[in-house]
Swiss-Prot record:
Major localisation: cytoplasm
Assembly information from the UniProt record: Heterotrimer of UreA (gamma), UreB (beta) and UreC (alpha) subunits. Three heterotrimers associate to form the active enzyme.
Compartments where located: Cytoplasm
GO molecular function: urease activity
Gene3D superfamilies in the cross-refs: Urease, beta subunit
Keyword set includes Phosphoprotein: no
EC number(s) recorded for this UniProt protein: 3.5.1.5
The name this protein goes by in its record: Urease subunit beta
Cytoplasm is among the record's keywords: yes
Amino acid sequence: MSGSSNQFTPGKLVPGAINFAEGEIVMNEGREAKVISIKNTGDRPIQVGSHFHLFETNSALVFFDEKGNEDKERKVAYGRRFDIPSGTAIRFEPGDKKEVSVIDLVGTREVWGVNGLVNGKLKK
């Protein structure tokens, strides 16, 4: 091909290139995180995504507060999600009990759909 160049020129933009800024990305900076435990009492694996309202997860998941007490009303999960990178998930195999970090949902603090337990603004 005459007139075309496949050579890279430093300082020029390259289509499809990803340029990263210096430093680290701090996830959920300034947000208060709590560590709770969750156990899968079911007979199938359960995977929960990063922004899923934990209060409305599969009923086979049992929640424990920061002191290790079972929370049958799921108060520790109400209005919260996992403190993990967007687009990731945590998987609970049958019988698994894991300590997880959770943070409050932010923005308009509305939850619609899911299991239909809130369908509107969160109360706290």
